[in-house]
Amino acid sequence: MAQQAKAHVKMQRVSVSKAKLVANLFRGKDATLALGILHNTPQKSAKIFIKLLNSAIANATNNHGMDASKLFVKEIHVNEGPTLKRFQPRSQGRAYEILKRTSHFSIILEERA
């Protein structure tokens, strides 16, 4: 089995459905190509993925001695985190619930043969 480099980030204030749309853009691509795609993606979750991908590349080169130019995104997971519940006051004593959703991201890089 080839060596793998991992990076995780939790409790990010972006919904899972919106983050998965961005994750699907670079799943299976080379790491350098994925960074280029993310830099040209205007979504909020793209900035989180840029930091996460840079962290995974640094883990691969520093901890495992892998070549950064041969890395590709083997797996990427976007999972649902805890939902923060807030209330918006409305007229006549009512309150509407506002759900602030969070996400957990993880990425696994591997060296191409």
From Swiss-Prot:
Signal peptide: none annotated. GO terms for cellular component: cytosolic large ribosomal subunit. SUPFAM superfamilies: Ribosomal protein L22. Pfam families: Ribosomal_L22. GO terms for molecular function: rRNA binding; structural constituent of ribosome. Disulfide bonds: none annotated. Transmembrane segments: none annotated. GO terms for biological process: translation. Keywords: Ribonucleoprotein, Ribosomal protein, RNA-binding, rRNA-binding. Part of the 50S ribosomal subunit. Belongs to the universal ribosomal protein uL22 family. This protein binds specifically to 23S rRNA; its binding is stimulated by other ribosomal proteins, e.g. L4, L17, and L20. It is important during the early stages of 50S assembly. It makes multiple contacts with different domains of the 23S rRNA in the assembled 50S subunit and ribosome. This is Large ribosomal subunit protein uL22. The gene is rplV.
